[in-house]
């Protein structure tokens, strides 16, 4: 079974993935944040530095590469919880293109690489995940959780408008463009599937419909 945990920055994907790994015994592939040298530069560099050094494009390539290798291994082994995945990667590239952080030539290159990677995944016996657990909540909740996890490079007040830009289109994109698997939608403002045992039990029962959890 391959389960993707998706949702906005800071919404609780890693915590949920860790819980799912413990409950199901599946291997957890965490988002490649630690050790990513480009990520803090993307958040902290000036507009001029971004334009000169192309940090937004480099970051997307970095994530695309790591997520491709992760989903490829996960699908081959059919035994994984994925903290974010290659399927949502395009959304972030698209939004940064809309903001002008990624130029047209870079976007064309990115889309070509992504298309080739998806073609390669389609050659595998298992071609897609079994289900996506989509975490969503209010924008206030997103901001609070970003602050709570305390990554210094994510906390600049000037980033709020960037987070809002991502947030405003996220839900629509997931429900209109994500086609790789069925979706289990969790409103984190209404349910706590990590720490509330009743909510967790209900969620795991729903998840078990996609594969038997022993």
Language model segments and positions:
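A glycine- and Lys/Arg-enriched "phosphate-lid" helix/loop adjacent to the NTP-binding pocket
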Residues: 92-168
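NTP-dependent small-molecule kinase module
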Residues: 143-214
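Conserved lysine of the Walker
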Residues: 13
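Hydrophobic positions on the alpha1 helix immediately C-terminal to the Walker A/P-loop
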Residues: 16, 20
